[in-house]
Structure formats: C-alpha cells, structure tokens
Amino acid sequence: MGGETKVFTLAEVSQHNNAKDCWLVISGKVYDVTKFLDDHPGGDEVLLSATGKDATDDFEDVGHSSSARAMLDEYYVGDIDSATIPTKTKYTPPNQPHYNQDKTSEFVVKLLQFLVPLIILGVAFGIRFYTKQSSA
C-alpha cells in the first residue's frame, strides 16, 4: 500500500454491487471482496446485500473473529469519502402529554374507594325512606 490512499464516494462504491465486482464499506474503508465471495462462511448473498451502503453495522452485528478482521487488510482498496455517506437519523418519539399513568390509576382507585360506599349508603337511605313512606 505505497503512495496515496484512494478516496471513493459512496456512489462509486455502489456501482460495484454484483458477484463479479463486489465492494463493501466497513468502518470508513473500502474493500473489494469479489475474490472472497465464494469463501465467505455466510454465503455470497450476505456480502452482496451489504453493497451500496455503509456495511459497518452489518459487519459488527455478526461478531467477526480477529482473524476475519485481519483478513480485511488484503481486500483493502481505499477509504470512503464520509461526506457521501448519508447520516443516520436518530429516532425521536413524538411529543406526548406528560402524565403519569400509575398516578392516574391510583387516583381513580382512591376516588372509587370513596364514592362506592357513599353511593351504597345513599341507595340504602333512599330505599328506607321509600319503604317508610309507603307503609305509613
């Protein structure tokens, strides 16, 4: 690897996306893995599906061994222009009213504990009052 390191855009790397010409972007570096497709333990489809994008997460999620990481050096062809890689947008949930669900249900339980006995007492007095008037 003498001389200057070649810098590729993601568009350039994306053109190398088939079994006869397969390039990957992993950790800011570009690798030509065409010769490795047949030897890859996970099959060539795994590598081909990672073309045209930053495949760093795909590579890291598998948990490659240190020997697999060392193997990357022999397929290195240059670096990626990081400005050409789309930034990942972090998911932010929509704003919702702030209320505590636990406190709301706790309030309802206390309210029912107070109201149910009052309603029962009111019904009992109503029945007694009604039956007293009808017998008189």
From Swiss-Prot:
Domain Cytochrome b5 heme-binding, residue spans:
5-81
Question: In which tissues is this gene expressed?
Answer: Is highly expressed in developing seeds, moderately expressed in flowers, and is expressed at low levels in the leaf.
Q: Subcellular localization, per the record?
A: Endoplasmic reticulum membrane; Microsome membrane
Please give, as recorded in its UniProt entry, the membrane topology of this protein: Single-pass membrane protein
Residues that coordinate or bind heme? 40, 64
Highest rank taxon of the organism: Eukaryota
- Report one GO cellular component: membrane
The answer on whether this UniProt entry bears the keyword Heme reads yes
Keywords per UniProt = Electron transport, Endoplasmic reticulum, Heme, Iron, Membrane, Metal-binding, Microsome, Transmembrane, Transmembrane helix, Transport
Name the PANTHER family for this protein: CYTOCHROME B5, CYTOCHROME B5 ISOFORM B
Provide the family line.
Belongs to the cytochrome b5 family.
What role does it play? Cytochrome b5 is a membrane bound hemoprotein which function as an electron carrier for several membrane bound oxygenases. May play a key role in the modification by desaturation of fatty acids in the endoplasmic reticulum, which in the developing seed is utilized for membrane synthesis and in the developmentally regulated production of large amounts of storage lipids.
Q: What is this protein called?
A: Cytochrome b5
Organism per entry:
Nicotiana tabacum (Common tobacco)
Which lineage ranks, top first, belong to the organism behind this chain? Eukaryota, Viridiplantae, Streptophyta, Embryophyta, Tracheophyta
